């Protein structure tokens, strides 16, 4: 009996398919987040953050985070990651916070305990998916200006004056 190429291909494809099933990731993807976030909000500008208190790692935090909207008096998603010197997670805390809790992001070493704590904040729906692991990740990322003033009052008078001159009028 001679070997069948079709049978060999079938066996090879079956083996590859089994390997692909075994290589699934434990982390969430952007596609998962879009599925989690519905299009309606309880109030204008409503948003969600992953929330957990001292979870063992990022997967445990994101997996069991309650699917609720942040309170109106909050604006950002906060993440605090405590890790060993090797980078292994000790604890993960995520929550909705006001601006004041996001003013000291970054990483610091705990010399006596031998671990590092990195803190980050972000603005947006479920934006706190990843963990901060170093100074590059431990940032305060916003999509809108933090200091929302009404602009400079003298700018309006300058613009009006320029329009008057351009139109050939005098003040």
Curated annotation (Swiss-Prot):
UniProt short sequence motif NxI motif, positions renumbered to this chain: 88-90
Signal peptide: 1-25
Keyword Cytoplasm recorded: yes
Positions of the pro-segment in this chain: 148-171
One GO MF term: acetylcholine receptor regulator activity
Membrane topology note: Lipid-anchor; GPI-anchor
Stretches assigned to the UPAR/Ly6 domain: 47-141
Protein's recorded name: Ly6/PLAUR domain-containing protein 6
Species annotation: Mus musculus (Mouse)
